[in-house]
């Protein structure tokens, strides 16, 4: 499905409810599978979270997670400690191109039985679940934080917990801290000192409290997704002064790294006010003429949104810390270069950075390829406030935000299938 979008005016005051964070939901789903008396509220309705939940509840020998990268990493660790079960974990053609070797080797250090079905280092992989007693493991610090989180999430189930040493410079710290905070929330003792993370096994008392006997259930509420909020920050930035969008449900002391949006978008003319469990976004000032040296090492998922916003505002930007974007749903840096160039942008990329030169005009009615990447579709959509735009394969948004197009209609966007 291709959608043509246009909007001359965004409704000046709107309210949108966004479902729970995909990142938090997927972590908590794994913990719930390990400790069944945990119950969850406000979980994500994304395809990725549904795939994760289905895989955790199912009994299939072949587990296909399609495009869900988080599920691939987390389930690799989960099935490694699921005693007595053997599975083949596979995914889409793109997933089979995304490396898994670093995580597999780390789990093998602990004693896990994992082998490759085809090419070494890549899915599909065969996992034979077993009891793991080793607890010391090293992993490169500059890899995807999902590898690190996968190991941390299974740690309270291990007989001796885990002592994880991160080798080199650490990236994506907020996602690691999110995982540790969620473990703390269910009563797991953790520490993160220097480059060493310790996660203790749950005591007998704590195991009973969260579900290994028959205790009173514990309910955890998932905060709404900040990555999904980013598209509304972009819409407000590109709209006229006075535009206001209220989003729920959000915390000022969020665990999500993408909450850095609040400070970044101040430079782009958006004020954020926390009211009860909501955030109110207001377009109040003219943006700065340049967004310089914006380091997204801790929040790379909002890079596409930010650069599209800057193009729409006619300002330049220089974004760094983007090295993980090359192994996402697509090579996001190259995809951005290709699609922004179609719109008339002057853009250059390296392995870990992006530079956009200020451009006054945007080419209208350009077809934006989405590369099976939900964030490409959603990041470019707000540009319809500046020029009509066509989003190819628009249904890809269901990976993280199935209601996205309906929510844009509520804001006054006009869309037509083409």
Q: What is the predicted role of each segment?
A:
Residues 1-418:
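Short, structured segments at the rim of ligand-binding sites
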């Amino acid at each position: 499905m291709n959608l043509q979008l246009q909007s001359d005016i965004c409704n000046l005051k709107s309210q949108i409810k966004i479902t729970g964070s995909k990142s938090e939901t997927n972590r908590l789903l794994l913990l719930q599978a390990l400790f069944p008396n945990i119950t969850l509220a406000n979980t994500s309705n994304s395809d990725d979270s549904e795939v994760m939940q289905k895989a955790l509840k199912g009994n299939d020998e072949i587990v296909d997670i399609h495009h869900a990268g988080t599920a691939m990493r987390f389930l690799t660790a989960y099935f490694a400690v699921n005693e007595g079960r053997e599975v083949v974990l596979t995914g889409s053609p793109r997933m089979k191109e995304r490396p898994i070797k670093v995580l597999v080797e780390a789990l093998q250090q602990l004693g896990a039985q994992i082998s490759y079905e085809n090419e070494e280092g890549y899915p599909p992989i065969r996992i034979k679940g077993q009891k793991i007693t080793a607890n010391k493991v090293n992993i490169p610090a500059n890899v995807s934080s999902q590898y690190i989180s996968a190991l941390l999430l299974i740690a309270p189930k291990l007989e001796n917990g885990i002592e994880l040493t991160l080798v080199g410079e650490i990236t994506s710290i907020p996602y690691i801290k999110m995982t540790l905070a969620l473990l703390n929330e269910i009563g797991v003792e953790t520490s993160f000192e220097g480059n060493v993370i310790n996660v203790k096994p749950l005591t007998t008392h704590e195991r009973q409290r969260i579900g290994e006997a028959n205790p009173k259930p514990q309910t955890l509420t998932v905060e709404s997704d900040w990555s999904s909020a980013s598209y509304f920050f972009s819409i407000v930035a590109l709209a006229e002064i006075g535009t206001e969008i209220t989003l729920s449900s959000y915390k000022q002391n969020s665990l999500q790294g993408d909450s850095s949006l609040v400070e970044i978008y101040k430079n782009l003319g958006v004020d954020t006010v926390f009211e009860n469990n909501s955030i109110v976004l207001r377009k109040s000032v003219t943006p700065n003429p340049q967004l310089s040296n914006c380091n997204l090492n801790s929040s790379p998922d909002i890079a596409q949104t930010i650069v599209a916003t800057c193009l729409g505002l006619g300002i330049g930007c220089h974004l760094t810390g983007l090295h993980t974007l090359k192994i996402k749903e697509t090579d996001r840096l190259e995809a951005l270069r290709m699609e922004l160039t179609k719109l008339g942008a002057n853009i250059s990329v390296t392995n870990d950075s992006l530079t956009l030169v200020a451009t006054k005009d945007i080419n209208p009615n350009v077809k934006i390829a989405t590369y099976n990447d939900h964030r490409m579709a959603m990041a470019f959509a707000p540009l319809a406030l500046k020029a009509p735009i066509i989003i190819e394969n628009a249904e890809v948004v269901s990976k993280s935000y199935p209601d996205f197009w309906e929510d844009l209609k509520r804001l006054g966007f006009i869309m037509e299938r083409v």
